């Protein structure tokens, strides 16, 4: 009797433990399933918000910004709508229309490029649009051409002035060299004249010295012949 009571008690305890473990497993699986559903919904929501934000950034990059528009408000709203885990999208590259407007002034944007099909022609539509833009605003093109001509004229004027300066410097160098050669030639001529004068003076002095020697010799001979032999008679 006691053994049967113990056996029933053990069976009841094992059944209770199995039921409690199964209930805990079911609750944990339901919680995990709900958690996985919530995370997938959040991920899908973040993906949708990121794609909307990216398209909005592209539209803002292609549309011209007005003067009275406040870009800080839109940036702050986009920052609030942007999910936390997604990095900010890269800025769009500059299109050909912005380059054309920067070169030729404020012009209307060209129509978007269409996809080529089998019925499309061989010509390029972008060249036609640029020609239409130039034809619609010739004033900016004339101003740009005028500025180019002014730049060329300034370059030519600078080259001409540089050539004139070089030519004047060359003439001055030649004149200074000619003056130095003339001074040197005058100095050498003066020295040659001085040498010739000194040579003639030296020759004259030599002749005068010889004449003085001859005169002194003749005077000595006369003195010897005029000597008295006796003093007075008795």
UniProtKB/Swiss-Prot annotation:
UniProt modification remark: Phosphorylated.
Positions of modified residues (Phosphothreonine): 231
Gene3D superfamilies xref list: 1.20.5.170
UniProt short sequence motif Nuclear localization signal, positions renumbered to this chain: 152-159
CDD domains: bZIP_plant_BZIP46 (cd14707)
The bZIP domain, residue ranges: 163-213
Superkingdom field: Eukaryota
Record bears the keyword NAD: no
Gene Ontology biological process terms from the UniProt entry: positive regulation of DNA-templated transcription; regulation of photoperiodism, flowering
Changes seen on gene knockout: Slightly delayed flowering. In the plants missing both FD and FDP, fd-2 fdp-1 strongly delayed flowering, even in the presence of high FT levels.
Keywords assigned by UniProt, alphabetized: DNA-binding, Nucleus, Phosphoprotein, Transcription, Transcription regulation
MF term (GO), any: DNA-binding transcription factor activity
GO cellular component, one term: nucleus
InterPro entries: bZIP, BZIP46-like, bZIP_sf
Region (Basic motif) location: 165-184
Tissue expression notes: Expressed on the flanks of the shoot apex.
Keyword Calcium: no
Subcellular location: Nucleus
Assembly with partners or alone: Self-interacts. Interacts with FT and FD/BZIP14. Interacts with CPK33.
Entry function: Transcription factor required for the transition to flowering promoted by FT.
Name used for this protein in its record: bZIP transcription factor 27
Gene name in the database record: FDP
């Amino acid at each position: 009797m006691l053994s049967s009571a113990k056996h029933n008690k053990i069976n009841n305890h094992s059944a209770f433990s199995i039921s409690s473990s199964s209930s805990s497993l079911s609750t944990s699986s339901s919680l995990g399933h709900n958690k996985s559903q919530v995370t997938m919904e959040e991920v899908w929501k973040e993906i949708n918000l990121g794609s909307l934000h990216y398209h909005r950034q592209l539209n803002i990059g292609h549309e011209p910004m007005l003067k009275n528009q406040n870009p800080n408000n839109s940036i702050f709203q986009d920052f609030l709508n942007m999910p936390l885990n997604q990095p900010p999208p890269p800025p769009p590259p500059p299109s050909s229309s912005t380059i054309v407007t920067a070169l030729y002034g404020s012009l209307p944007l060209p129509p978007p490029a269409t996809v080529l099909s089998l019925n499309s022609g061989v010509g390029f539509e972008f060249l036609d649009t640029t020609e239409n833009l130039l034809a619609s605003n010739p004033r900016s093109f004339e101003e740009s051409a005028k500025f180019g001509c002014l730049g060329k004229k300034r370059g030519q004027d600078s080259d001409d002035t540089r050539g004139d300066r070089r030519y004047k410097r060359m003439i001055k160098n030649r004149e200074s060299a000619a003056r130095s050669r003339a001074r040197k030639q005058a100095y050498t001529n003066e020295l040659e004249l001085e040498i010739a004068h000194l040579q003639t003076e030296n020759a004259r002095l030599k002749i005068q010295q010889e004449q003085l020697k001859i005169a002194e010799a003749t005077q000595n001979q006369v003195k010897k012949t005029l000597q008295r032999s006796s003093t007075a008679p008795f």
